[in-house]
Amino acid sequence: MNIKIVCVGKLKEKYFKDAIAEYKKRLSRFAKVSIVQVPDEKAPEKFSAAEDERVKQIEGERILSKIKDKEYVYVTAIKGKQRSSEEFAKEIQNLATYGHSDITFVIGGSLGTSNAVNKRGDDLISFGKLTMPHQLMRVVLIEQIYRAFMINSGSPYHK
């Protein structure tokens, strides 16, 4: 299985990089994991709704350029469907069972994702109503992917 995480912006904090590297290493026995970063678009601190949409559109085009047609795509979104870890694990298992060996997760920038990215997504996934930095979301996401594989393998990691 191939897991790809497409993110907007560079990860600067060493502690986030270290956590992601650790989960990538742990996941390597189950799947090939790649993290693709696309540049974030600079925006003024105070901007209009039109400027907000322009930034999301530009970042969205960058995201979409990294996604292939055959990939099953989850887009992280506050308004996405919330799942338990067990439900998420079952979805990953079902995708693998039914021939989806390439799964992509998208984490948008600080403004979210464009309508085009959301439409390309096969599913919108939410990790709760809380707002968190998109850099932290990378760690949360990769840990939950690892947890899903551990649940599916019957490991006591998930208690």
Swiss-Prot record:
Recorded GO MF terms: rRNA (pseudouridine-N3-)-methyltransferase activity
UniProt enzyme class: transferase
Pfam families: SPOUT_MTase
GO-annotated cellular components: cytoplasm
Keyword check for S-adenosyl-L-methionine: yes
Localization: Cytoplasm
Keyword set, alphabetical order: Cytoplasm, Methyltransferase, rRNA processing, S-adenosyl-L-methionine, Transferase
Positions with a binding annotation for S-adenosyl-L-methionine: 108, 127-132
Gene3D superfamilies: 3.40.1280.10
Family label: Belongs to the RNA methyltransferase RlmH family.
Job of this protein: Specifically methylates the pseudouridine at position 1915 (m3Psi1915) in 23S rRNA.
Subunit structure, interactors included: Homodimer.
Protein name: Ribosomal RNA large subunit methyltransferase H
Classification of source organism: Bacteria, Bacillati, Bacillota, Bacilli, Lactobacillales
Gene symbol of the encoding locus: rlmH
